[in-house]
Amino acid sequence: LRTHDCSPEALAERRPQLRLWDADINDTLPTLDCSDYMNTDAGMRAWIEAIQRHGVVLLRGVPAQPGQLLDVARRIGNVRPSNFGEYYDVVSMPNPNASAYTAMGLELHTDLANWNSPPDVQLLFCIKSSVRGGESLFADGFKVATDLRDRDPEAFRLLSSHPMDFRFHDDACDIRASAPTIVLDGEGRITRVRFNNWLRAPMSLPEPLIEPMYAALGTFWNMLRDPGYHLNLRLDPGCLIAYNNNRVLHGRASFDPTTGERHLQGCYLNL
């Protein structure tokens, strides 16, 4: 009976204890050594607990070579392929089909918002980084959404009640989805954040909702851009950061590709 106790206290005890964060995480970012993660149960457990609680964890000491990313990912589970392949190389290239493959700065976003079920975890692994610029940026979407609920309840209600449309299309595919920016469970707890202005399509909502929805979205976006919420991190070769793609938004500063090399690899997995 204790195992199946459904009292509020028992349910709360079984539920993962989230630790919402803001810019203070720059001093307390969960960080692990790659060898501990790869070779010990304690290291793997620490990685999983960091993802569950903070939504983000940094690995140091990964051999800075192509292919290491998938070894790290498969320590946890099966890699989830996307329309970009089993993994992808984040480099500046001519005629890109995604903004990640440019040198421009990227605003905070979650990946694959145009999928009905975006992947749970994203991994980014630095192989080379000698360019000027290109620092990574992260924010806890659950923290920002929680603060939005306190500051502007109507904006929160709109973004959690009405869907946004997302679309990615190129010569090979056309993938679309529709979902709220903030997803709640049956008790009103925030369970997902889906935000990507690169993939956001025109709204398909009743006309009276269009202006209020844009205003609510703008309020949320302005909060996301507040440096008080930001984790700022320069990924050096051998560093691999993993984060909950349905909670933690990521972006980057622009960089000058003429000043050196920048080569990251990324992939996705579900927990």
Predicted regions and their residues:
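Short, structured interface segments
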Residues: L1-R14
